[in-house]
Amino acid sequence: MARNSKFSKNTLFYQVFHSPEFADYQEALYPSRMIRSLLQIYPLRASRWLLGLDTTVLVDTLNCLSDRIRQKTEFYVPLGESSGVYPFVIGGRKPFVLLIPGGAYAEVCTLNEGFMMALALNRMGWNAFVCKYRVGKEAHFPNPQDDVADCLQWIFQNAAQMEVNTEDYAVCGFSAGGHLAASWG
């Protein structure tokens, strides 16, 4: 998947969090500051028992994200002060999925429920977009629903340029994101 092999199963979580290309995206990699602090002493190979994540998939995902950021691929599009979309576009007039990660409306678990899933969907021939929606004190109705609407509006407005098929798409989510997707309709 990734061309770059900057990270390996022996890389410490600390090294990932403090990698220059991820400086602006630490919260997206793992939102909880407490968990980020605890993880720092462990290598990525501990991800299976620490986080329930497949180590190979995690390492491939981190290397792919690192490549995208360093190659200046459009990685994040802010749509509001605390919301936006992460495009994972393969083009080719393929359909798309808008992924809405969970996080109990307190945070957004973007790495495992967004980025990892988006790359898996890309491999299956789908364009994918990961929604970052308002959480915490900003998660009052209808703010998160408005953020989903903003993501979809941005996708539809930019679909021709990205070569994304807007006739066939899905909105899906995990946990709080699943609730949000179901609320969307």
List PLM regions with ranges:
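Alpha/beta-hydrolase active-site loop
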Residues: 140-161, 183
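Short beta-strand element of the alpha/beta-hydrolase
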Residues: 94-102
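Glycine-rich nucleophile elbow surrounding the catalytic serine of serine-hydrolase chemistry
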Residues: 173-183
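N-terminal cap/lid segment of alpha/beta-hydrolase-fold proteins
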Residues: 32-92, 141
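Serine-hydrolase catalytic-loop signature spanning alpha/beta hydrolases and amidase-signature enzymes
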Residues: 104-107, 128, 154
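Gly/Ser-rich "nucleophile elbow"/oxyanion-hole loop immediately N-terminal to the catalytic nucleophile
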Residues: 156-175
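Active-site loop/turn elements of alpha/beta-hydrolase fold enzymes
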Residues: 102, 126, 133-135
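Short amphipathic alpha-helix adjacent to the substrate-entry channel of hydrolases
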Residues: 110-129
